[in-house]
Amino acid sequence: MGFQIAIDGPAASGKSTVARLLAEKLGFDHLNTGATYRAVAVYLHEKGLSPSSAEEEIENALKNLKIDYVNGRVYINGKDYTEKIQSPEAGVLASNFARLEVVRRHLVRIQREICDDKNIVVEGRDIGTVVLPNAHLKIFLTASLEARVERKLKEYQKRGLKVTKEEVERELISRDEQDSKRNVAPLKPAEDAVIIDTTSMSVEEVLDRILKLVRERMNT
C-alpha cells in the first residue's frame, strides 16, 4: 500500500488548495472526492433524477458508471464534467445527493479503487472516517464561517460568477448543516485526525505544518 494522506473539512476550509499543493510538493497523486460527488450529482440531474427519485432508478444510473480523475479534471464515462461542476448549484446538488446511501456506496468504492496502492493525497468530507480509515495521516481543516465565506466569494468571482456575500453565506450554512447532519457518513473529524484551524493561517503555514507531520509519519 502507498502512503495515503486524508484531508477532510467543511466547504471552503482550504482543502482543495492545500491538498493540491501538498501533492505537488510530495510528488503524490491527488484526488478531490468533492469533485467526483459534484460530477455525479450533475450527471444524475441531467438524467432527470433527483435525491427524491426511487433508489432503484438511481442505482441503475450508477451501475455502469466510470469515473476518471486526471490532472484535476473529472470524467464520467469519458465525458469531461469539470466545467459543469464549478457553479454554486452543483455544490448544492452534490450535498443533496451525497445524503443518499446508494450514491455514497458507489462513490466510496470508486474512490478506493482510484487510491489503491498509490502515494496519494485525498480530500473530502469522509476520507479519514470512511473512504480511507487506515490512512497514514489524517488532517481535518476548519476555519471560521466569515473566513470561509470570503474565500468562497473570491473563488466564485475569480471564475466570473456573479454572487453576493449573503448568497455565499447562505450556501455554506446550508451545506454545513446537510454535511454534518446526514445519516450516512456525516462530516466529522476522525478520532486520530490532526485538527488545524486555518482561519488566520496562510496556505504556506498550513502546508509547512502538514509537511512536518508527513515527515514524522514517514520516518516512524
From Swiss-Prot:
One of its GO terms (molecular function) is CMP kinase activity. InterPro entries: Cytidylate_kin, Cytidylate_kinase_dom, P-loop_NTPase. GO terms for biological process: nucleobase-containing small molecule interconversion; pyrimidine nucleotide metabolic process. Pfam families: Cytidylate_kin. ATP binds at residues 9-17. It catalyses: CMP + ATP = CDP + ADP; dCMP + ATP = dCDP + ADP. GO terms for cellular component: cytosol. Keywords: ATP-binding, Cytoplasm, Kinase, Nucleotide-binding, Transferase. Its EC number is 2.7.4.25. Its main location: cytoplasm. It is found in: Cytoplasm. NCBIfam families: cmk (TIGR00017). Belongs to the cytidylate kinase family. Type 1 subfamily. This is Cytidylate kinase. It comes from Thermotoga sp. (strain RQ2). The lineage of its organism: Bacteria, Thermotogati, Thermotogota, Thermotogae, Thermotogales.
